[in-house]
Amino acid sequence: MTAITDIIAREILDSRGNPTVEVDVYLEDGSMGRAAVPSGASTGAHEAVELRDGGKRYLGKGVEKAVEAVNSEIYDAIGGHDAENQIQIDTIMRELDGTPNKSRLGANAILGVSLAVAKAAAEASGLPLYRYVGGPNARILPVPMMNIINGGAHADNPIDFQEFMIMPVGADNIRDAVRMGSEVFHTLKKELSAQGFNTNVGDEGGFAPGLKSAPEALDFIMKSIEKAGYRPGEDMYLALDCASTEFFKDGKYVLEGEGRTLEPEAMAEYLAELAAKYPIISIEDGMGEDDWDGWKYLTDKIGATTQLVGDDLFVTNSARLRDGIRMGVANSILVKVNQIGSLSETLDAVETAHKAAYTAVMSHRSGETEDSIIADLSVATNCGQIKTGSLSRSDRLAKYNQLIRIEELLGPQAAYAGTSILKA
């Protein structure tokens, strides 16, 4: 009854107005799963590869080739297979593609099918997706990393670091966490406006003011947390995504907004200073994706007290993660389904992290859709943290709203991760 009977892919638009792939998977019993694929702006060199059309249409970003791959070659390979055999289906698609980075058929094609298959199987089983994927023990609601000031590749301003986030660790539940984040977000808007900064938002819904340095952004956030009635370092903590690969040039970190260039050790020292001065509990991509020595130095320096998240470093790839674990580099992995290109490989990366006592943070991309699957996956994996943007833009809020629904469905079983994520 859960055999795949039809697959239909189409080209839709993401939150940046760029084309992306949406896939519908139909099963023998009439169940249907629909998934839309996200896309990143700051992408790691080691990520699985999206298939784009090139040419003039959509300025080269069309995905008709990926859509055609789904509707023909992929359907021919997995049509008739049981949707409940997720690993088998993902393996068939990976082998059909035949490249190490899914570049022939496109990670966007393979991922769209992979996620839609899981959604269809969940519907056929009569279970919500988080329960279907995670089983009976899936019940942890994640602490959100809320990106309220954007810089770097996500905004047109001088700030070098890409994301400045708040984490409402002191909330009692996900509803309170969202409320607390919203209150700080709107307080920050007033603070920025009062000092003459624009309050336009970036790709992920955070503000993109013309600030020049990380401390300047952090000071605004600290003040806004306090003005909203919360205590930095108790109710709310801070997190950074430096996206350092974006400004790692010729072996050095070029902070153009701050007007200085740092050697890897000096960059690590700078991050350590920020973590000591502010209640920062998580730093993502503090060093460049191939600066393994810099990562090791940073980990040795502050890894015992600070979550050090590898995004471009690990690209949701279990093999790269195992390299990092062996070298004692970082202590957490950012999990983005489209970096690796299938659901089963995504879940394997989370499992690999947890077995090594690394944390995992479920994450969106800067180019998102209304699809809220990462909310379900964050609960399914009990990873305890989610990164899905700010408290504006419906493509971001879709995930927060889904978490609120999941918490309601779980009832008394629901547990908010809260202070359990703190390292020290």
Curated annotation (Swiss-Prot):
- Keyword Disulfide bond listed? The answer is no
Give the PROSITE patterns listed for this entry.
ENOLASE (PS00164)
Pathway assignment? Carbohydrate degradation; glycolysis; pyruvate from D-glyceraldehyde 3-phosphate: step 4/5
Entry-linked Gene3D superfamilies: Enolase-like C-terminal domain, Enolase-like, N-terminal domain
User: GO terms for biological process?
Assistant: glycolytic process
Q: Which reaction does it catalyse?
A: (2R)-2-phosphoglycerate = phosphoenolpyruvate + H2O
One GO molecular-function entry? phosphopyruvate hydratase activity
Task: State the InterPro entries in the record.
Answer: Enolase, Enolase-like_C_sf, Enolase-like_N, Enolase_C, Enolase_CS, Enolase_N
**Could you tell me what the cofactor note in this record states?**
Binds a second Mg(2+) ion via substrate during catalysis.
Instruction: Name the Pfam families on file.
Output: Enolase_C, Enolase_N
Sites where the protein binds (2R)-2-phosphoglycerate: 162, 336, 365-366, 387
The active site of this protein is located at: 204 (proton donor), 336 (proton acceptor)
> What does this protein do, in the record's words?
Catalyzes the reversible conversion of 2-phosphoglycerate (2-PG) into phosphoenolpyruvate (PEP). It is essential for the degradation of carbohydrates via glycolysis.
Q: Which family does it belong to?
A: Belongs to the enolase family.
Q: Know the name of this protein?
A: Enolase
Q: Which organism does this record belong to?
A: Allorhizobium ampelinum (strain ATCC BAA-846 / DSM 112012 / S4) (Agrobacterium vitis (strain S4))
Q: What is the lineage of its organism?
A: Bacteria, Pseudomonadati, Pseudomonadota, Alphaproteobacteria, Hyphomicrobiales
